[in-house]
């Protein structure tokens, strides 16, 4: 049975576009080969320049057995409280990376995330859009 979901809001699409543009700018300037943390700080700078609120290394609590637990999960970047960015600097995106961002989306009750791998020749090829019901 196919489920029908509401489309992604225009505001969320706008934030996704800003995020993709920021990743392009960072990658164009620095290229591949650096640590994730470097790309993360540079992405935060791009968001600040664009006047977009973003938080980094935001804790994701886990509700288990009716108890809110600190499981040491952290979202790389949360853009305007709505869009999750998971940044990587790996040779290849693995299924576990996609599972990670899907889990973050579910645990935080958010719909859209971007999985961005900076260790690619062309950033477009390293950017994956993940939509969660």
For the regions a protein language model found, what residue spans apply to each?
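Conserved catalytic cores of phosphodiester-cleaving nucleases, focusing on short active-site segments
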Residues: 31, 54, 75-93, 104
């Amino acid at each position: 049975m196919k489920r029908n979901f509401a489309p992604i809001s225009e505001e969320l699409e706008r934030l996704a576009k800003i995020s993709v543009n920021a990743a392009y700018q960072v990658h164009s300037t620095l290229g591949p080969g650096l640590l994730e943390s470097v790309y993360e700080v540079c992405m935060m700078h791009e968001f600040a320049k664009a006047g977009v609120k973003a938080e980094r290394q935001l804790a994701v609590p886990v509700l288990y057995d009716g108890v809110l637990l600190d499981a040491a999960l952290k979202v790389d970047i949360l853009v305007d409280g709505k869009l999750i960015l998971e940044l990587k600097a790996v040779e290849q995106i693995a299924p576990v990376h996609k599972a990670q961002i899907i889990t973050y989306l579910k645990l935080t009750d958010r719909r859209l995330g971007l999985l961005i791998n900076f260790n690619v020749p062309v950033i477009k090829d390293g950017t994956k859009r993940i939509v969660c019901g």
